[in-house]
Regions:
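Rossmann-fold NAD(P)-binding glycine/threonine-rich loop
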Residues: 1-17
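Conserved structured core elements
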Residues: 2-7, 26, 30, 181, ...
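Flexible loop/turn segments at secondary-structure boundaries
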Residues: 6-10, 32, 207-210
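Acidic, His- and aromatic-enriched active-site or binding-groove loops in soluble protein domains
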Residues: 18-34
Length: 302
């Protein structure tokens, strides 16, 4: 499962296909670890050893070491406090992923996200939950991030794919692999060749975070080999992160329950719980508009 929203799809798979052989993944942390590697002068993010816990698009690094066991957190924290994830190569020639203006703002805003808990290093997506007022104020409803992606990355990728199909070859097609491709290839190699590498996966908690819902689909480091994955226990997590995660995982579980039961009430509750939405009345308005916009795709909600 390499989809978006991976968290909701992962929860749906857990509920509806509990015996399926599914690995749920997201590459956003990989891109951020590339940035952290550059902060520390390390060429390959795969040299980093780390502890991480959270939900998909909703997590924190609590420990980061190099391959010699040196603690990199002080150096990374110093950079985050000054610059967020901005590292000076956002507009570097040849760089194609996460170069849109919204991503530049997101990487810079990570400084403020980090300030909320300077003991951990946050995932960038937390800006939507911790600073929703900022996101609304700096967004253009007539040209959203979705429009930006469709006019940029999507147009380039789809155009390159059509060109490859027309030519019958990918040679000299100008289409280069990036973080998305490298991550899935590394994971496939680990499964096929039993490399026992460490990956961040979205898996049933079952004690990986002992003071959190055991049925939650959490994002934690796992060792991956030919027999699948083994979770690395992260230990109890702080109250702040635990509270945020409990609220967000309830959103995700209620969305899946709403789909299974065809329940308007539960989807309204899910949106009401989301920290991106200020009130139940706004949640209801959004839900009604979503139903109208997606009437050809959604089940009937009662």
């Amino acid at each position: 499962n390499y989809s978006n929203p991976a968290a909701i799809v992962a929860e749906a798979c857990r509920v509806l296909r509990p015996n399926s052989r599914i690995i749920n993944i997201c590459d956003m942390p990989i891109d951020l670890m590339d940035k952290m590697s550059r902060m520390c002068g390390i060429k390959d993010r795969r040299e980093l050893q780390y502890s991480y816990y959270g939900l998909n698009h909703f997590g924190w690094w609590s420990k980061i070491y190099d391959k010699e066991g040196n603690d990199l957190m002080p150096q990374i924290k110093e950079h985050m406090a000054k610059n967020g994830y901005l590292d000076g190569i956002e507009h570097e020639a040849g760089k194609e992923q996460h170069v849109e203006e919204s991503w530049i703002h997101t990487f810079g805003k990570a400084k403020d996200v980090y300030a909320v808990d300077p003991e951990t290093i946050p995932n960038t997506y937390l800006k939507y939950y911790l600073y929703p007022d900022y996101v609304v104020e700096t967004s253009d409803p007539n040209y959203t991030r979705a429009n930006e992606v469709m006019d940029g990355r999507e147009k380039k990728v789809f155009g390159a794919c059509r060109d490859i199909i027309a030519k019958g070859t990918a040679k000299d097609g100008g289409f280069e692999p990036d973080v998305h491709a490298n991550y899935i290839v590394d994971l496939a190699c680990a499964l096929a060749e039993n490399t026992l590498e460490r990956f961040l996966l979205i898996v049933p908690n079952d004690g990986a975070v002992p003071n959190f819902d055991p049925t939650a689909m959490v994002e934690v480091p796992c060792i991956v080999g030919s027999n699948g994955f083994e979770k690395i226990c992260q230990g109890p997590i702080p109250q702040f992160q635990k509270g945020l995660m409990e609220q967000q995982v309830s959103v995700e579980k209620l969305v899946v329950q709403a789909w299974v039961e065809g329940s308007y009430q539960k989807l309204w509750q899910a949106l009401t719980l989301s920290k991106t939405i200020p009130s139940a009345s706004v949640a209801k308005q959004i839900l009604d508009e979503l139903i109208e916009a997606n009437k050809d795709f959604w089940p009937e909600l009662k």
